[in-house]
UniProtKB/Swiss-Prot annotation:
Residues holding Cu(+) 1: C124, C127
Gene Ontology terms: cellular component: late endosome; trans-Golgi network membrane
Active-site positions on this chain: D1067 (4-aspartylphosphate intermediate)
Role description: Copper ion transmembrane transporter involved in the export of copper out of the cells, such as the efflux of hepatic copper into the bile.
Annotated Mg(2+) binding sites: D1307, D1311
Nucleotide-binding as UniProt keyword: yes
Leading EC class: translocase
Name listed for the protein in its UniProt record: Copper-transporting ATPase 2
Tissue and organ expression note: The short isoform is expressed primarily in the liver with lower levels present in the intestine, hypothalamus and ovary. The long isoform is expressed in the liver.
Free-text domain note: Each HMA domain can bind a copper ion, they are tightly packed and closely interact with each other. Wild-type ATP7B can usually be loaded with an average 5.5 copper atoms per molecule.
Species of the source: Ovis aries
């Protein structure tokens, strides 16, 4: 390569930076360096100017250049770089970090440039005039035009005087937010100087919420060299302005990838050659591997002959001659490169280089670092630095051992690929990869390779690798000196094994035995340990991926498994390298809250097996000993009698199928023990059956008893004439005989379960209502039986009055209440059973061969699925476990988690959820969470915990009975004692009021009978029958009335709590909205005469008829309705691209149009509105090429979306609607807006609740923009958006902790935990079965006004329950003293039958009071509208407070203004505000692409249909 000639006199000499941009000039052509001084510049700031005061004389520079040309050993490549670039770089660093660009006046003639600046915050024409006046006064501004409607400014300026960034700063100083619009003109300096700004656009996939945007903007904005970051959630892209001499697009991409997202460089503005910093970077890479010693006597040569070492490289990715020149010019500049020749045809490069200055690896990295960044370099012999003519191999050194953790291996093919490729790398002696443990042990030469290079090589193969341990020990091999004559044995090196090639330089290495990596690691470090972290703040799958990917890159971390719903992370780590607290700190650095769970040991596997073939105790011992000796099994117990084995194991080490295989290997057969499905512990069928039988038995024998009792209460003038009073035998009347027979059956059959419950209660030292019931009935029965036996024994003339009528009445009413109680409990528990029914029963576990080819498929029960299994899921099947997609693409219905109807795109690496439905393609997934660790199991746990936290309605009565029962027993005992004392003191009192006893009975007996009678009367009349009926009867009547009004209320708990509700939380999709997408607008973008509306609808409807997407179904349904037909045209070549749109060819629509026109008749109002349309008379079939989708889909197909169309789409998207573009035959011809419309009564229901003093909150898994749009329509001020089911539960608990009673209104499976946790859960009748079962109240008619009606009815019912309780208490307060004989002195005394009658009367009074609820009438719609008339006002966006996920920071709209009523102003993310000045100035760029749809579940992206 020749040196460039001198420039002509008078022309300015190029700076070092400009020289590097000229492909015809090398590094050695620099004759003069420019230094920079500060001088007053535009707007009071300073800008650089050129001065030659500090330039060295030409002689000095010439001497320097001559030394380089001569290859003097005194001048190194680092000196070259520092000498050439230090002054320029030093100054450009200072200026660029302050946001200014280098001024090159005198180097390049002045010229003007045009640019566009986006401005946020303008509200009127006064703002426009202020900005125009301020900016036009700046030096270098030619003209400026500000548009209020477009929120932008068109500026023409002189780049050499002022930059767009300086203009932006001036506008921001006025109080507005300004940023350079994307895609506009850049300054001249940025096109020439590699040290100025460049822009790169990256496609970022995996963002699901605004927190993802904030996370990316915050982290990337803090990187050195990043000027501005703008992330679009809807477009799934990031536009980054950066300084290329500090950071490269590949670095930005890697940083975003490390955060858990998938980033791809779409396009960039890159320098055409290497800048000074790029060269410095390449120079720094030379220190990776130490160069061989340099012969100081040779000048830039390796051999006495002075010739360099030749190296042949294969270079892929070259496309034209410019690629060849790019490589030759830039690589030829590197120190140590003597010559380079690149061949485009053979895709090779021959380099003559000096190995003392540059290594083959550095050359490879230098070529691959050249723009555009798509060159791939490989060595023909597969080893770096082993060129064919290499004569000076490096000196050998002692080998080292390292252990890698490798994630992503799925089969033996992965193991062979890694071992085959890594073993060929230079310096690698041997490698052993272990699939089960996910590790690799490598023996390598540290003088020829580096652990980080090996780790990067594994990652280049598509796996994730991290370094666990390193060990470099000098005693592993002998010392080999160059002049030693001692053989390997004498030197201490082991003799190579048979078949093992000697290593270069006579180095021999130990063979790595194929054993567990844990044993290999034990020689260098301790065994890995496992810790568990509690993590909060995760909102979506990208948070999980973010944590897993970043932790796995940390040294010492073996594996990471994060569970989103459980909020836990399982980390396997090397305790020598890292500790749990450090891991928690790493998670905290990622922006999450993390704490080490000290006492948590993880969930061990539990397996119950049926074993056949056992004959004696020896078989049991053999099985148990075999299992207990197996690593990973913590417990094993085998029962010979039942042929069952109970095994506990660590799922990290061993799985259920492995245990089954172990048992079969020793000669027995094992299978999964049959278990009762749907969680038998939640089933109340046994209790329901027993209390039902108890009630029916008591009823059958109790009805005659009650009939006879009523008969005896009828007044009779001749009481002795009754047939029932006749004695069968002396002392035993017919009535008492019938009472005895009936009561005996009731006492011992119908009352059996009461005796069981009372016994259990007394055994635990408690006295509840069961004890009181049993005590009262038993004493009444025993007393009646005793006095009847005595009367018969004494042959009394009259049969005594007994209490045989008391037990049947008590048992009938109480058994009925218990039966109803357990029925309600069973209905509540059915929610859990239905949740469990979502779980698949079997999984298709596959075995993969090379290239992921399925070798074998096996149907495995869910209990036998192990972590790490590869599972195949076909279209329409359920995902059996949580996992990651290994192969295939599909759409998954995850509504059970998100509650949103839109399917989610799944591709390799995506997370899938157990219980969700696979909608389209067949996929292979890797199981990550199985058994109780799945997301579905966590939801079941949430619902179960919420339900268990609720006390049953009987708890209050039981608590009251805990005091009432002992009190009544004491009163009864005191009554007995007092009357005994009174009777013996004054027998006349007893004789006066006690029925005439038979002759021959002593006074003492009379006194004891009377005292005992009063005591029994107290127990009978004080029985809590009325208390037990007060609530259940009101509940039964109230729920019946509610059901008649379209409200299903489950039990007394919701009725009791609903009147206390102070906060109502509404879900969005399916609750506030209909949950079904509908077309809200069709906008034609072409002339009606060219393409009529009916033809557009016919074509679009035909195209969408082949789509299964919910939006496509909605569009098809609309087109059929508008065309008045059920048949559409013919669709061919249909192709659907998830996340973008569809393309197809449509024909045969002419007959549909002609038929529609014949059936249409007179023009409709819709036709009059759109204008007359020409009829279709062309009989020939026309074929249309159709594209339907989002902006990105149109861009991919070469169509331009104009600003007017973008504005129309943005207008709909800010309202929470999805805008779809339609192109026919390559022409953008229409836009269709699809929305999930708000229910008509939603706003009225919200207003009525507010007028009742109830706070209303909207909580949804949808994005915050859609949530805000819905909230403004219905009048809700507080919104929680982008929340998970666990977040909904947490929000309910948060409000409950503030002392508020919370009602949750929802319709989906994802709402069921919150419905169960809330004080009152209200489900929409059209919702899922799980939600309906988990809720306390169900709105059968799907009318939100019924939420108001349920609260209103609750208040009426609770008032009635309180009245019933007052009546019951009054009865007891009056009846107990009367029964005790307190009022005997005034002549008031109760006979035993009177006590029974009084008890019955109290029950009847309570029942009649409850029946009054049947007169309730629900307020009608007219009444609600009359109350709301003149008071309902719409909300603006600024009046709605939005919180995202578990974030308690408010996401309010901008300050209220007239602009709020017509436009939505994008929010400024908070994270970039923490970055440098430039990021703060540009963080408010208008993101028009935020296309959240009401129908999207967890993706802020327009869904293709």
């Amino acid at each position: 390569m020749e040196r460039a000639g001198d420039q002509a006199p008078g022309n300015p000499e190029p700076s070092s930076l400009a020289t590097l941009g000229d492909p015809q000039v090398t590094l050695l052509t620099v004759h003069k360096r420019w230094s920079f001084k500060r001088s007053p510049g535009t707007g009071g700031s300073s800008r650089p100017v050129i001065s030659e005061e500090e330039c060295p004389p030409p002689s000095e520079e010439g001497e320097f250049s001559q030394k380089v040309l001569n290859g003097s050993e005194e001048i190194s490549s680092k000196q070259i770089l520092s000498k050439l670039f230090q002054p320029a770089m030093k100054q450009s660093f200072a200026f660029d970090n302050n946001g200014y660009e280098d001024d090159l006046d005198g180097v390049c003639p002045s010229q003007t440039a045009a640019g566009t600046i986006s401005i946020v915050g303008m509200t009127c024409q006064s703002c426009v005039k202020s900005i125009e006046g301020r900016v036009s006064s700046l030096k270098g501004i030619v003209s400026i035009k500000v548009s209020l409607e477009q929120s932008s400014a068109e500026v023409r300026y002189v780049p050499s005087v002022v930059s767009l960034m300086q203009i932006c700063h001036q506008i921001e100083d006025m109080g507005f937010q300004a940023s350079v619009a994307e895609g506009k003109a850049t300054s001249w300096a940025s096109r020439v100087s590699p040290t100025s700004e460049a822009v790169v656009k990256l496609r970022v996939e995996g963002m699901t919420c605004q927190s993802c945007v904030s996370s990316i903007e915050g982290k990337i904005g803090k990187l050195q060299g990043v000027m501005r970051v703008r992330v679009s959630l809807s477009n799934q892209e990031a536009v980054i302005t950066y300084q290329p001499y500090l950071i490269q697009p590949q670095d930005l991409r890697d940083h975003i990838t490390d955060m858990g997202f998938e980033a791809v460089i779409k396009n960039k503005v890159a320098p055409v050659s290497l800048g000074p910093i790029d060269v410095r970077r390449l120079q720094s890479t030379l220190s990776v591997a130490p160069p061989a010693p340099v012969n100081q006597n040779d000048n830039n040569s390796e051999t006495p002959g002075g010739q360099g070492v030749p190296l042949h490289l294969r270079v892929d990715g070259m496309h034209c001659k410019s690629c060849v020149l790019n490589i030759e010019d830039n690589i030829g500049q590197l120190p140590g490169v003597q010559s380079i020749h690149v061949s485009l045809e053979s895709r090779t490069a021959r380099v003559q280089y000096n190995p003392s200055l540059v290594s083959p690896g550095a050359l490879r990295r230098a070529i691959e670092a050249l723009p555009p960044g798509n060159f791939k370099v490989s060595f023909p012999n597969g080893a770096e630095g082993s060129g064919p003519d290499s004569r000076t191999p490096p000196a050998p050194s002692a080998p080292c051992t390292m252990m890698l953790a490798i994630a992503g291996m799925t089969c033996k093919s992965c193991v062979q690929s890694i071992e085959g490729l890594i073993s060929q790398r230079v310096g690698v002696h041997q490698i052993s990869v272990f699939l089960a443990e996910g590790t690799a042990v490598v023996l390598y030469d540290p003088s020829r390779t580096h652990p980080e290079e090996l780790r990067a090589a594994v990652e280049d193969m598509g796996f994730e690798a991290s370094i666990l341990a390193e060990n470099c020990s000098s005693n592993q091999v002998g010392n080999h000196s160059a002049g030693s004559a001692v053989g390997p044995e004498a030197a201490g090196a082991p003799v190579p094994m048979q078949g093992e090639a000697p290593q270069p330089g006579g180095l021999h290495t130990n063979h790595i035995p194929h054993q567990s990596p844990k044993s290999l690691l034990a020689s260098t470090t301790v065994a890995p340990k496992k810790c568990f972290l509690q993590i909060s703040g995760m909102t979506c799958a990208s948070c999980v991926s973010n944590i897993e990917r970043n932790l796995q890159k940390e040294p010492g971390i073996l594996s990471v498994l994060v569970a989103l719903m459980a909020g836990k992370a399982e980390v396997k780590y090397n305790p020598e390298a890292i500790q749990p607290l450090e891991i928690a700190k790493l998670v905290q650095d990622l922006g999450f809250e993390a704490a080490v769970m000290e006492d948590y040991t993880g969930s061990d596997g539990d397996l119950e097996l049926m074993i056949t073939g056992m004959t004696c105790a020896s078989c049991v011992h053999n099985i148990e000993s075999k299992l207990r000796r197996t690593e990973g099994i913590t417990y094993a117990s085998v029962a010979l009698a039942t042929s069952k084995a109970h095994v506990k194991f660590d799922p990290e080490i061993i799985g259920p199928r492995d245990i089954v295989k172990l048992i079969e290997e020793i000669g027995f057969r094992a299978s999964l023990a049959q278990r009762i499905p749907n969680a038998h512990h939640l089933d109340h069928k046994v209790e329901i059956k027993q209390w039902k039988n108890s009630f029916l038995c008591s009823l059958v024998f109790g009805i005659p008893v009650m009939g006879l009792m009523i008969y005896m209460l009828i007044p009779s003038h001749e009481p002795q004439s009754s047939v029932l009073d006749h004695n069968v035998i002396p002392g035993l009347s017919i009535l008492n005989l019938i009472f005895f027979i009936l009561c005996t059956f009731v006492q011992f059959l119908g009352g059996w379960y009461f005796y069981v419950q009372a016994y259990k209660s007394l055994r635990h030292g408690m006295a509840n209502m069961d004890v009181l019931i049993v005590l009262a009935t038993s004493i009444a029965y025993v007393y009646s039986l005793v006095i009847l036996v005595v009367a018969v024994a004494e042959k009394a003339e009259r049969s005594p009055v007994t209490f045989f009528d008391t037990p049947p009445m008590l048992f009938v009413f109480i058994a009925l209440g218990r039966w109803l109680e357990h029925v309600v409990k069973s209905k509540t528990s059915e929610a859990l059973a239905r949740l469990m029914s979502l779980q698949a029963t079997e999984a298709t576990v596959v075995t993969l061969g090379e290239d992921n080819v399925i070798i074998r498929e096996e149907q495995v029960p869910m209990e036998l699925v192990q972590r790490g299994d590869i599972i195949k899921v076909v279209p329409g099947g359920k995902f059996p476990v949580d996992g990651k997609v290994l192969e295939g693409n599909t759409m998954a219905d995850e509504s059970l988690i998100t509650g949103e109807a839109m399917p989610v795109t799944k591709k390799p690496g995506s997370m899938v959820i157990a219980g969700s439905m696979n909608a389209h393609g067949s996929v292979l997934i890797t199981a990550t969470h199985v058994g109780n660790d799945t997301t579905l199991a966590q939801i079941v746990k949430l619902v179960e915990e919420a339900q268990m936290s609720k006390a049953p309605i009987q708890q209050l009565a039981d608590r009251f009975s805990g005091y009432f029962v002992p009190f009544i027993i004491i009163i009864s005992t005191v009554t007995l004692v007092v009357w005994i004392v009174i009777g013996f003191i004054d027998f006349g009192v007893v004789q006066k009021y006690f029925p005439a006893p038979s002759k021959g009975i002593s006074q003492a007996e009379v006194v004891l009978r009377f005292a005992f009678q009063t005591s029994i009367t107290v127990l009978c009349i004080a029985c809590p029958c009325s208390l037990g009926l007060a609530t259940p009867t009101a509940v039964m009547v109230g729920t019946g009335v509610a059901a008649q009004n379209g409200i299903l209320i489950k039990g007394g708990k919701p009725l009791e709590m609903a009147h206390k509700i102070k906060t109502v939380m509404f879900d969005k999709t399916g609750t506030i909205t209909h949950g079904v997408p509908k077309v809200s607008r069709v906008l034609l973008l072409v002339d009606l005469a060219t393409l009529p509306l009916r033809k557009v609808l016919a074509v679009v409807g035909t195209a969408e008829a082949s789509s299964e997407h919910p939006l496509g179904v909605a569009v098809t349904r609309y087109c059929k309705e508008e065309l008045g037909t059920e048949t559409l045209g013919c669709c061919m070549d249909f192709q659907a691209v998830p996340g973008c749109g569809i393309s197809c060819k449509v024909s045969s629509v002419e007959s549909i149009l002609a038929q529609g026109e014949r059936l249409q008749g007179p023009p409709t109002a819709h036709q009059n509105r759109v204008g007359s349309e020409p009829s279709e008379t062309d009989a020939a079939t026309q074929t249309f090429s159709v594209l339907i989708g989002n902006r990105e889909w149109m861009r991919r197909n070469g169509l331009t979306v104009t600003s007017d169309v973008r504005d129309a789409m943005t207008d709909h998207e800010t309202k929470g609607q999805t805008a779809i573009l339609v192109a026919i035959d390559g022409v953008l011809c229409g836009m269709i807006a699809v929305a999930d419309s708000v229910k008509q009564e939603a706003a009225l229901a919200v207003h009525t609740l507010k007028s009742m003093g109830v706070d209303v909150v909207l909580i949804t898994g949808d994005n915050r923009k859609t949530a805000r749009a819905i909230a403004t329509q219905v009048g809700i001020n507080k919104v929680f958006a982008e929340v998970l089911p666990s977040h909904k539960v947490a929000k309910v608990q948060e409000l409950q902790n503030q002392g508020k009673r919370v009602a949750m209104v929802g319709d989906g499976v994802n709402d069921s935990p919150a419905l169960a946790q809330a004080d009152v859960g209200i489900a929409i009748g059209t919702g899922t079965d799980v939600a309906i079962e988990a809720a306390d109240v169900v709105l059968i008619r799907n009318d939100l006004l019924d939420v108001v009606a349920s609260i209103h009815l609750s208040r009426r019912t609770v008032w009635r329950i309180r009245l019933n309780l007052v009546l019951a208490l009054i009865y007891n307060l009056i009846g107990i003293p009367v029964a005790a004989g307190v009022f005997i002195p005034i002549g008031v005394v109760l006979q035993p039958w009177m006590g029974s009658a009084a008890m019955a009367a109290s029950s009847v009074s309570v029942v009649l009071s409850s029946l009054q609820l049947k007169c309730y009438r629900k307020p009608d719609l007219a009444r609600y509208e009359a109350q709301a008339h003149g008071h309902m006002k719409p909300l603006s966006a600024s009046q709605v407070s939005v919180r995202v996920g578990m974030d308690d920071r408010r996401r309010d709209s901008p300050r209220a203004s007239a602009w709020d009523q017509v436009s939505y102003v994008s929010q400024v993310s908070l994270s970039p505000l923490k970055s440098d000045k430039l990021s703060r100035h540009s963080g408010a760029a208008d993101d028009r692409g935020d296309k959240w749809s009401l129908l999207l579940n967890d993706r802020d992206e327009e869904q293709g249909i």
